[in-house]
């Protein structure tokens, strides 16, 4: 029994030491170190009179280089299409996408224009069955897309700690705020060393 308590205590101290280490700061430090090494190699190659980019390209095959260029091009296209991510630009893109898929019935419009029904205010307009079908199909398509996204977003949950979507959002917000404080308690509870 004494061995188990000492091993638990050692594990507790190791975990506490790991918690004190800031993983984000370590990653930042490592990235800066890699950038510094890269710059050092570049300067050394320039001092020797070598073409640094050409020397680096020796490590890659032609296929890898082409795939990398294609990947960069796709990323550049995505970034240029997406632009700034705010609600008004997102709504504008959705509107333009819907407008591009919208096919107006010009024949019916011309007939209404000739008869004068288009310009007189009246409440006796009845849409055609085709127009109603298009409306219903558009609405069901949007609903299916929203449900698909909702299912994909919830697929990664191991166990449900919520009763509705709003409650799930609230719980996620709490987790972001308090996980750093409650992680140790949860780990102790799972390990069986809770006080």
Curated annotation (Swiss-Prot):
Annotated localization: Nucleus
Basic and acidic residues bias: start-end ranges: 66-80, 94-117, 153-164
Region entry Disordered, spans: 66-164
Keyword Nucleus applies: yes
InterPro entries to which the protein is assigned, alphabetical: mRNA_splic_SYF2
Highest taxon in the source lineage: Eukaryota
Biased composition range(s): Polar residues: 81-92
Family: Belongs to the SYF2 family.
Function per UniProt: Involved in pre-mRNA splicing.
PANTHER family documented for this protein: GCIP-INTERACTING PROTEIN P29, PRE-MRNA-SPLICING FACTOR SYF2
Protein's UniProt name: Pre-mRNA-splicing factor SYF2
Protein source organism: Yarrowia lipolytica (strain CLIB 122 / E 150) (Yeast)
Lineage, highest ranks first: Eukaryota, Fungi, Dikarya, Ascomycota, Saccharomycotina
């Amino acid at each position: 029994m004494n061995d188990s308590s000492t091993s638990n205590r050692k594990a507790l101290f190791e975990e506490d030491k790991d918690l004190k280490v800031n993983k984000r700061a370590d990653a930042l430090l490592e990235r800066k170190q890699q950038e510094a090494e890269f710059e050092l190699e570049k300067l050394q190659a320039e001092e020797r009179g070598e073409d640094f980019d050409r020397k680096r390209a020796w490590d890659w095959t032609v296929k890898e280089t082409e795939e990398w260029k294609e990947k960069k091009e796709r990323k550049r296209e995505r970034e240029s299409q997406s632009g700034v991510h705010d609600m008004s630009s997102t709504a504008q893109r959705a509107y333009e996408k819907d407008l591009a898929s919208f096919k107006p019935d010009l024949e019916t419009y011309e007939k209404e224009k000739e008869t004068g029904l288009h310009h007189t205010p009246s409440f006796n307009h009845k849409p055609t069955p085709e127009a109603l079908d298009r409306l219903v199909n558009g609405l069901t398509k949007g609903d299916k897309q929203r449900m698909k996204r909702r299912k994909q977003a919830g697929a990664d949950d191991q166990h449900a700690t919520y009763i509705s979507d709003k409650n799930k959002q609230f719980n996620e917000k709490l987790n972001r705020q308090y996980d750093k404080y409650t992680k140790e308690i949860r780990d102790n509870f799972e390990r069986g060393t809770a006080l």
